[in-house]
Curated annotation (Swiss-Prot):
GO biological process, one term: iron-sulfur cluster assembly
PANTHER family: FE_S BIOGENESIS PROTEIN NFUA (PTHR11178:SF51), IRON-SULFUR CLUSTER SCAFFOLD PROTEIN NFU-RELATED (PTHR11178)
Protein purpose: Involved in iron-sulfur cluster biogenesis. Binds a 4Fe-4S cluster, can transfer this cluster to apoproteins, and thereby intervenes in the maturation of Fe/S proteins. Could also act as a scaffold/chaperone for damaged Fe/S proteins.
Taxonomic source organism: Aliivibrio salmonicida (strain LFI1238)
Protein known as: Fe/S biogenesis protein NfuA
Single GO MF annotation: 4 iron, 4 sulfur cluster binding
Disulfide bonds: none
Length: 194
């Protein structure tokens, strides 16, 4: 069963909005382009006639959230909150698995590392317009990654790799990974500038 957490403040916010809609209207939580780098989550009104037979209904105290079959696995562990601060109020929707489906603990090492990169590393790099891709894992347990986007040519790549990405992945995959290297560093040859 998919676990989508809608906080009490978000439920109250939705209940106020739904009170102004025709009776029987609930909400729909969905992912556009699920399983891709361009995945985006959204929430919309869901009138009774828009409920599909293969939708999953998640019941909350004052409302139901409907999720379509395709979006369901990508909304695992999603969190919807309504936050109020000095700047005002806003709805936040965090879906760590929107870009990549959750993998099992017994999945191959490559899939588990790829999942960690997509769900933990890339969201941090996205703020700088960058991302990292897992290219291969050598027999010696070295994860070879390639930086892209805003990270390409950035002077902070080495620091990001050693202090951030490598530390995080080696702690998470202790005994399975021995190092994390940048493809250009691992592949240095005649084409390299330095």
């Amino acid at each position: 069963m998919t676990s989508i957490n809608i906080t009490e403040s978000a439920q109250e916010h939705f209940a106020k909005l739904l009170a102004q809609q025709p009776e029987g209207t609930n909400i729909r939580v969905f992912v556009v382009n699920p399983g891709t780098q361009n995945a985006e989550c959204g929430v919309s009104y869901c009138p009774p006639e828009a409920i599909e037979a293969n939708d999953t209904e998640l019941k909350f105290e004052n409302l139901s959230a409907y999720v379509d079959e395709l979006s369901l696995p990508f909304l695992e562990d999603a969190d919807i909150d309504y936050v109020t601060d000095k700047m005002g109020s806003q709805l936040t929707l965090k879906a760590p698995n929107a870009k990549m489906r959750k993998v099992n603990d017994d999945a191959p090492l490559f899939e588990r590392v790829e999942y960690a990169i997509q769900t933990q590393v890339n969201p941090q790099l996205a703020g700088h317009g960058g991302h990292v891709s897992l290219m291969e894992i050598t027999e010696a347990g070295i994860a070879i990654v390639q930086f892209g986007g805003g990270c390409n040519g950035c002077s902070m790549v080495d620091v990001t790799l050693k202090e951030g990405i490598e530390k995080e992945l080696l702690a998470q995959f202790e005994g399975e990974l021995t190092a994390v290297k940048d493809l250009t560093e691992h592949d240095r040859g005649e084409h390299s500038y330095y």
